Each structure stands twice: as C-alpha cells, then as structure tokens.
Amino acid sequence: CPNLGIAAHLNIMEGKALTDCPLLTNDEGSFNIGYGYLILNQKKWELLEQIEQEFRAQIEKIKENDVEIDHLDSHVHTHAIPEIFKITCKLAKEYNIKYVRTQYEELYFIPKLLKHLNFSYPMNLVKIALLQYFTLKNRKTLNEYGLKSNDFIIGVGYTGMMDSDAIKYGLKAIEEESIVEALIHPCKYDDATKNSHTKEF
C-alpha cells in the first residue's frame, strides 16, 4: 500500500519509555500508569512536561527510520485527554503533521444479543460517553492549531468484538461524506477473546 498513511501511535501505557519520565514509569523504566491517573493529574505541569518529552522522543524515533508520519493517535486513546491532546496538537504543528485522531463515536447497536451479554459492553458505553465529551472539547484545540481530524470513529463500543457486522452497522449510523476511522486490531489467535484490548483501557 504505497499511499497508506502511517501514524505515530503514541504510547505511555505499556512497554519501555524512551526517556526518563518517572511520573509515568516504574523503577525499571516501564510504563505503569492507568487512564484514570492521567485524567486526574492532567493539569500537573511536571507530568505534562514528561509526556511531551516522551511523545517527542517517539516521533523522533520514527522519523530517524525515514518514515513519513501522516497523523498522530495513541495507545488506548491517552491523547484524547484534553490537556494531553493540547500537547499532541502542539507537536503535530511543530512536526508539520496535519492530522490528529479524535474519538467521536455515534452510539449504534448490532442486532445480535450475544454482542451485548458480556462485561465489556457496558464499560464500552462509558468509554463512548467519555470520549465523546473529550472530543467536543478537543475540536476547539484542533481549530486553534489549524489541524485536521476524522469526523467519527467506530470500534469503541464493540472493543474486543469487532467484526464485519460491527463495521457495517457502525457505518450505517454515520453521515455520508464523513471521514471515519475504524479501530481494528489484527488478531494473533483463533480465540478472539485472547486478542481483546479491553483491559488496557
């Protein structure tokens, strides 16, 4: 796919950090924070400084390998948190990256009962509401920086359950002529439950 846009998938949730960021990592330099921690502490200057430093290092690492970055997004939507989104947009502008992902998903339902009889689905509805709220705030930041974004996203409500039906019904709920991102994690296992990213969020 020679024309496929490649994102910098910014990560401060798992794995090893590229920088010294003790507010994000354990003593071994591995990320060990949760989404709630980031929301509650998003106004703390020192934390934001370390996040910017780590995001910058990750962008630079990609650029060192001669990869042109088309857009920015993040692991488990950490950049959606409004104060972190501001950092992301600042870096996008600095590195001439024109697109930053936003996470507004229209609520939709697949007419299959088993899709909803699990512990993940109610939590996914909470995620949708939170990310919708963040996106409404973040669109103002996008405009301030003159950046572009997708109009909608599909895949949050059915995280861990994505299939052709989830995509089909998700697209039906969205206005035509919209830019849409579908969140799909390639599977490693025949047992789809082993590929679930629900716990990460």
Where are these regions (language model features)?
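Active-site histidine-anchored catalytic micro-motif
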Residues: 74-76
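Terminal accessory/targeting
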Residues: 1-71, 82-201
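Acidic, metal-coordinating catalytic cores used for nucleic-acid/nucleotide bond scission
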Residues: 78-80
